[in-house]
Amino acid sequence: MNHKDWDLVNRRLVAKMLSELEYEQVFHAESQGDDRYCINLPGAQWRFIAERGIWGWLWIDAQTLRCADEPVLAQTLLMQLKQVLSMSDATVAEHMQDLYATLLGDLQLLKARRGLSASDLINLNADRLQCLLSGHPKFVFNKGRRGWGKEALERYAPEYANTFRLHWLAVKREHMIWRCDNEMDIHQLLTAAMDPQEFARFSQVWQENGLDHNWLPLPVHPWQWQEKIATDFIADFGEGRMVSLGEFGDQWLAQQSLRTLTNASRRGGLDIKLPLTIYNTSCYRGIPGRYIAAGPLASRWLQQVFATDATLVQSGAVILGEPAAGYVSHEGYAALARAPYRYQEMLGVIWRENPCRWLKPDESPFLMATLMEWDENNQPLAGAYIDRSGLDAETWLTQLFRVVVVPLYHLLCRYGVALIAHGQNITLAMKEGVPQRVLLKDFQGDMRLVKEEFPEMDSLPQEVRDVTSRLSADYLIHDLQTGHFVTVLRFISPLMVRLGVPERRFYQLLAAVLSDYMKKHPQMSERFALFSLFRPQIIRVVLNPVKLTWPDLDGGSRMLPNYLEDLQNPLWLVTQEYES
């Protein structure tokens, strides 16, 4: 570490803290003219240069930050927020731990990305590139990983890009909630995680332990095995409900979400999502049992919809299937109805198709979160894709909106299904720098249904309906507006200004794509009115002030955001300007 890097990661984090908390209306930045602003906090004044964008959000130039003659440190700002947010010393200390871990992760990212231009970065393979992304754009401390020390971070955090093997258990079938798609069997799952030599070794150990079809194999993250399962589930081992088999199989690489792992030994098979009892961003990263049995049914139903609906077929959009899932309840903790949720989410698995299974030979995948990034020379990665495509920026953006937003909006309006499409849930299939189609994932808890009964939803299995949240249309639309427009496009549109596309023009292009889609489907006019994207105001979701003051961070209950209904809608704004 050197002082220059330490100063840079602190400045970037302070800029993020000030801009997000100002957006969430914790305080207000006063304009001093000429793009100069100041924010007054108890005993301190922060000054900086920034541009206030169409969302009312400040894009702060981190190099211009000043707080009297003090060094620009994220810790200093957190201490100043203590009085503003009425935080206790204990709460500040907990978040200071997350702050330090985030700075450590950011330093590693700085090191790993050093010397790589935007063009260099997009030339990396998708697995390597996703390791170099910045993380959740809205939570200010997005790499807390509370529970991991330096050794665990270096071994399992994506920015270090290290690979590891999985620990395997055998679980008695009656002791496990298990659902496997009809088109997948356990042998296929195992061979997706082990080459023939390792599978033979695994089979030998399986037989040596006297195991048969009454047992199910279950992979476990090696950290979770060492820190939680080997101790907390000792009764299951002692009473013969589970058997530890050891480490087997391929090497795995952590994705940005930490829990989801990609096969680094043999690309293109199945990804595996495993619980980790660590606190990151807003909750403990376990896997709840509530959705396990319904997950494969939900993804199969969505795949059928996307294969038969003419608009979705034309879009080329793909659902990444979840062919199998399992969950093991802890007998002791399950008897404690009011125990913190983290004790109920310690052991399980979700198998998911890797995007490579759906790519054509001339396509390559990348996460949409990549478009929020820029290189060390402040060049947006989006610009490198546009340069490669040979298209102008407006044509490229129009294509992006067609392949991403139209399928999401059509799914919502026709079927009453909303997917929380943040930057890590959206994979784009690219051909020579041009977005071709979208690949969508994560339906266990991140899929919601409209409260009204739509006939197009009749074929959805009842088992899925029983565990899926249902919301009125005016709240369900927020999954697209907040989940995608605010959480993804809000961070892309300011970068496009550097590429010659003003923010208002950015959202005019989006409005034009949506208007064109709606004109082609006049029979759905009532649904478009029900799920209107052009109302003057939308919900402002407030995350950071809630997280920084949430009293139950030990996992007693999940953090719930606050909602304000005062956010001016850019789509309405640019439409009004266009019409006038």
From Swiss-Prot:
Which biological pathway? Siderophore biosynthesis; aerobactin biosynthesis
Top-level taxon: Bacteria
- What are the UniProt keywords, alphabetically? ATP-binding, Ligase, Nucleotide-binding, Plasmid, Transferase
Top enzyme class: ligase
Q: Which reaction does it catalyse?
A: N(2)-citryl-N(6)-acetyl-N(6)-hydroxy-L-lysine + N(6)-acetyl-N(6)-hydroxy-L-lysine + ATP = aerobactin + AMP + diphosphate + H(+)
Entry EC number(s): 6.3.2.39
The biological process GO terms on file are: aerobactin biosynthetic process; siderophore biosynthetic process
Q: Where would one find the signal peptide in this protein?
A: none
- MF GO annotations: aerobactin synthase activity; ATP binding; transferase activity
Consequence of gene disruption: Cells lacking this gene are not able to produce aerobactin and accumulate N-citryl-N-acetyl-N-hydroxylysine.
Stored InterPro entries:
Aerobactin_biosyn_IucA/IucC_N (IPR007310), IucA/IucC-like_C (IPR022770), LucA/IucC-like (IPR037455)
Say which family it is in. Belongs to the IucA/IucC family.
Summarizing the function annotation, the protein's role is: Catalyzes the attachment of the second N-acetyl-N-hydroxylysine to the carboxylic group of N-citryl-N-acetyl-N-hydroxylysine to yield aerobactin. Involved in the biosynthesis of the siderophore aerobactin which is a chelator that mediates the high-affinity iron transport systems induced under iron-stressed conditions.
Q: What is this protein called?
A: Aerobactin synthase
